[in-house]
Amino acid sequence: MNEAIIQLDHIDITFRQKKRVIEAVKDVTVHINQGDIYGIVGYSGAGKSTLVRVINLLQAPTNGKITVDGDVTFDQGKIQLSADALRQKRRDIGMIFQHFNLMAQKTAKENVAFALRHSSLSKTEKEHKVIELLELVGLSERADNYPAQLSGGQKQRVAIARALANDPKILISDEATSALDPKTTKQILALLQELNRKLGLTIVMITHEMQIVKDICNRVAVMQNGVLIEEGSVLDIFSNPKEALTQEFITTATGIDEALEKINQQDIVKHLPANALLAQLKYAGTSTDEPLLNSIYRQFEVTANILYGNIEILDHIPVGDMIVVLEGQAENILAAEKALHEAGVDVSILKRGA
């Protein structure tokens, strides 16, 4: 089991504006293991960006303890590192943002080289390093292009290369794909996954999109109004969300609400027979491999009319949603429900026949 590379314990962040006190982050504890791709999701104003800025102490917390890669960096209300040690620690933490923050008058390679200006490498070593970084992000052929000559995705690749210039152990992505189109977003996420695998890079993803969490992360924390309301593996959160906000994020990411709206307009649902019911089946892991609907027909003579089905792979484990009309004798449907529960399927009755 990997050890925690980032430990944020009981973090409070309070701002004072004139006569107002704003509690931006309230008693948040998050531990992120080495090699994680860890998502922090929430709407604007949830406190997620403010929280992650304490990792490299761009924002000092009001209270709490911060440990990064085994070193206590903040405790008892003050920074625990010398100025030199803090600078070195910050070199271990790269950041990328929604806005690429590239220098318009410098080429792609010059933008990456700028991050090495305080490095102890020789001029030749720096040049080789820049070439390697641009190759790593798939942009070596654009080394001499200026930002104005690059697409949004290419600019973000330059920003990623620059963030990796000092060989960080941690990469913080603050809404880094928000300004990109869906195709480019997928390409950037695929690149981040590749960097995670190749370099053992720990990635902290700040986003308001659960789809991104679903595509790339292995763990996720959900924030609301400065409070961490739910945290766990992506599989656990998607298959068994406990908080209303988490459920809202997930239904948006899976499209299940949109599917239900269309399903409810179908005649078979509008005029559901007395011996039928509309049900949502949620299942994960090994239960996706079993021919469960065939089994309940053979055992209980309960038919299943599939109106919607979707299976996705979350952290290498299949997770599925299905909306079906189950039809049969009342006692047989009850027995079929029980059998599905025993097989690890969550059954929600959406409507019963009249």
Curated annotation (Swiss-Prot):
Catalysed reactions, as listed in the record: L-methionine(out) + ATP + H2O = L-methionine(in) + ADP + phosphate + H(+); D-methionine(out) + ATP + H2O = D-methionine(in) + ADP + phosphate + H(+)
InterPro entries in UniProt: AAA+_ATPase, ABC_transporter-like_ATP-bd, ABC_transporter-like_CS, ACT-like_dom_sf, MetN_ABC, MetN_ABC_transporter-like, NIL_domain, P-loop_NTPase
Gene3D superfamilies: 3.30.70.260, P-loop containing nucleotide triphosphate hydrolases
Location of this chain's protein in the cell: Cell membrane
Keyword Metal-binding: no
Cellular component annotations (GO), alphabetically ordered: plasma membrane
SUPFAM superfamilies assigned: ACT-like, P-loop containing nucleoside triphosphate hydrolases
First-level EC class: translocase
Signal peptide limits: none
Enzyme nomenclature, EC number: 7.4.2.11
Superkingdom of origin organism: Bacteria
Broad class of where this protein is predominantly found: membrane
Subunit structure: The complex is composed of two ATP-binding proteins (MetN), two transmembrane proteins (MetI) and a solute-binding protein (MetQ).
Function: Part of the ABC transporter complex MetNIQ involved in methionine import. Responsible for energy coupling to the transport system.
Family classification: Belongs to the ABC transporter superfamily. Methionine importer (TC 3.A.1.24) family.
Protein name in UniProt: Methionine import ATP-binding protein MetN
Organism: Streptococcus pyogenes serotype M1
Encoding gene (name): metN
